[in-house]
From Swiss-Prot, chain B:
The gene is ASK12. Involved in ubiquitination and subsequent proteasomal degradation of target proteins. Together with CUL1, RBX1 and a F-box protein, it forms a SCF E3 ubiquitin ligase complex. The functional specificity of this complex depends on the type of F-box protein. In the SCF complex, it serves as an adapter that links the F-box protein to CUL1. Plays a role during early flowers reproductive development. The lineage of its organism: Eukaryota, Viridiplantae, Streptophyta, Embryophyta, Tracheophyta. Keywords: Nucleus, Ubl conjugation pathway. Residues 94-152 are annotated as: Interaction with the F-box domain of F-box proteins. Expressed in young seedlings, roots, leaves, floral stems, inflorescences, and siliques, with a slightly higher level in inflorescence than in other tissues. GO terms for biological process: auxin-activated signaling pathway; jasmonic acid mediated signaling pathway; protein ubiquitination; response to auxin; response to jasmonic acid; ubiquitin-dependent protein catabolic process. Pathway: Protein modification; protein ubiquitination. The keyword Nucleus applies. Coiled coil: none annotated. The keyword Ligase does not apply. It is found in: Nucleus. This is SKP1-like protein 12. Its main location: nucleus. One of its GO terms (cellular component) is SCF ubiquitin ligase complex.
């Protein structure tokens, strides 16, 4: 006896909702009573990798792709009758494929995630985009095209989470404006042809979390995010700009970067806008850019956690000013100690001998320091010693070795030596110093 | 501390005494308790005793507290054994869970049936559930063509 077909529609629909789209579509052929059942399902999870793999070459067959595209079109067209709560679409498309129009006009869609390895072309057709209920939008692609940001965002009046990675600004003056946005993740590549934007403004008064990675803009005229709690900022400096960043007033430098880089001091406006923040992560490039506004750096009164990432090609010029301006810092995370030595990383590190060293550190109330990517070089060990002597309130220092790149530990005996020194530091300082090494690493570095 | 008991009556006239805290995992029963109409027992016209026994077994297991401290992992293993049932019983359970509005049991039973569908061709699905194919060959061909991508 066929018990399953006699179950109420809602129940059968619930059973189907546990299946991926392909299997749901299959049931349409079981019998007449199953023909239209799939249309009742409020959650749709479409992943074309199921039917494209393992048979390669399937995707290229036009009829298959067309029928898949039609299916998606039809699913989205059903919205008026049976609203879709959640829709996830993962598929491999050619450049010519555009997203179905219905995706941009839906009265009920709440969450949308789009991922395309090559390019996502947001349709801005005649009717424009209207997704009045959309709360979360995630777009991941090598290139996202959507027109002007202001118009784009105005289509989502209640949007709370937005992720765009990676994208290019259409105009050189752009504004991110949304009263409802709480989480924003922008991974950008400047304007067309990898050019620095002229100005980027943020009018996002409800924003709590920001992940902003992009070429440095020449100006940040408006930064309205007073409620921001946490930010990760990566202001990318192009290779042909770094010299000018370090010597902004050097007239002898012959480069094209001049005019643009001289504006980078406006980054201070971005810093001013986020000065109420509690958790801040800055990359090596960002630190270089901040060196242009050390004197005007705002005070981060609420900052408890600061993370900085270092690279050997980038300097710590901004670190003393940063530390001085965080009067309530508790936790400092340093990913990579080695950095480009200048005479401006001043008293933060021990690289250049100076008399007044350590002052920005001495007044810093940080209680816990975490050092990641430790390579076991003498320079790093000296820096660690310098921190231990200078941070007056330090209670705990955790050191984690570099797991992937080259380290000094490959030299025979180096690991044991470093471990001994760190143990010594632990004994002679008031602070708890520990060096955490995975078993496999220890074995790798001690069997020489 | 003595716990409050309520009486559930199956469609075939059998009575089952159950702790109130266990029974109100069913939203339907929970509402009746709120509306205070449980004094003479709760008649469940749509659930026969054979199924009600299983429902009560499920609810007891899922009533996690100090007396019954069970981990999610163990619950998952228990679910597997619990759902080792004849097809007809599974469908009865689905209907009971739906009627009694016990979300986790409803999801579990539906997931079990979904797992029976997944990975099978339409012919295999029909065979598993005894579904009669009432399409004409032309009609079936048309349906397959419409969702061609799913059938390849």
């Amino acid at each position: 006896m066929d018990r399953v077909s006699n179950l109420p529609d809602g129940v059968r629909g619930h059973i189907l909702s546990f299946l991926p789209a392909k299997h749901i579509a299959l049931t349409s052929v079981l019998s007449k009573s199953w023909l239209n059942l799939w249309k009742l399902i409020p959650i749709l999870d479409i992943d074309d990798s199921e039917f494209l793999h393992p048979e390669e070459g399937k995707a290229e067959r036009l009829e298959i792709r067309q029928s898949f595209v039609d299916f998606v079109d039809r699913v989205l067209a059903l919205q008026d009758d049976s609203p879709i709560d959640r829709f996830s679409l993962k598929c491999i498309t050619e450049d010519e494929d555009m997203l179905p129009q219905e995706m941009f006009v839906s009265k009920t869609l709440v969450k949308l995630k789009i991922r395309n390895d090559r390019c996502v072309d947001w349709w801005c057709g005649k009717g424009g985009t209207s997704l009045p209920m959309l709360k979360s939008l995630y777009i991941d692609s090598d290139l996202i095209l959507w027109g002007k940001m202001k118009r784009f965002l105005s289509s989502f009046p209640v949007l709370e989470e937005l992720r765009m990675a990676s994208m290019e600004w259409k105009e050189s003056h752009e504004t991110v404006s949304s009263a409802s946005l709480r989480k924003l993740s922008i991974l950008g590549t400047g304007c067309e042809d990898y050019v620095n934007p002229k100005s980027i403004s943020f009018d996002t008064p409800s924003l709590l979390y920001l992940n902003y990675s992009d070429l440095v803009a020449e100006d940040y005229p408006l930064v309205n995010m007073g409620k921001l709690l946490e930010a990760r900022i990566n202001l990318i400096v192009k290779d042909d700009q770094i010299k000018r960043v370090r010597e902004p007033n050097n007239d002898l430098l012959q480069d094209d970067a001049g005019n643009v880089v001289l504006q980078f001091g406006n980054v201070v406006k971005l810093m001013n806008g986020i000065q109420n923040i509690q958790i801040l992560y800055l990359t090596a490039d960002t630190l270089e850019v901040l060196s242009l506004c050390c004197e005007s750096m705002p005070v981060f009164n609420n900052l408890k956690t600061l993370g900085i990432k270092s690279e050997e090609g980038r300097g710590w010029q901004a670190v003393p000013a940063l530390l001085r301006n965080c009067p309530h810092l508790e936790y400092l995370i340093i990913e990579g100690l080695l950095h480009n030595v200048t005479d401006k990383c001043g008293d933060a590190c021990d690289c250049i001998s100076r008399e007044d060293k350590g002052r920005s550190l001495a007044s810093c109330p940080v209680k816990k320091v975490e050092i990641q990517g430790f390579r076991g070089t003498m320079r790093e060990i000296n820096m660690i010693g310098h921190f231990l002597r200078s941070f007056k309130c330090l209670k705990e220092m955790g050191i984690f070795p570099e797991e992937e790149g080259p380290t000094n530990f490959e030299n025979p005996g180096a690991f044991e030596y470093v471990e001994k020194i760190l143990k010594l530091y632990n004994e002679i300082s008031n602070c708890d110093v520990y060096f955490l090494v995975w078993g496999y690493m220890r074995r790798k570095w001690t069997t020489q | 501390m003595s716990s409050k008991m309520i009486v559930l009556m199956s469609s075939d006239g059998q009575s089952f005494e159950v702790e109130e805290a266990v029974a109100i995992q069913s939203q339907t029963i929970a509402h009746m308790v709120e509306d205070d109409c449980v004094a003479d027992g709760i008649p469940l016209a749509n659930v026969e005793s054979k199924i009600l026994v299983k429902v009560i077994e499920y609810c007891k297991k899922y009533h996690v507290d100090e007396a019954n401290p069970i981990s999610e992992e163990d619950l998952n293993k228990w679910d597997e054994k619990f759902m080792d049932l004849e097809q007809s019983t599974i469908f009865e359970l689905i209907l009971a869970a739906n009627y009694l509005n016990i979300k986790s049991l409803f999801d579990l039973t539906c997931q079990t049936v979904a797992d029976m569908i997944k990975g099978k061709t339409p012919e295999e699905i029909r065979s598993t559930f005894n579904i009669e194919n009432d399409f004409t060959p032309e009609e079936e061909e048309a349906v397959r063509k419409e969702n061609q991508w799913a059938f390849e």
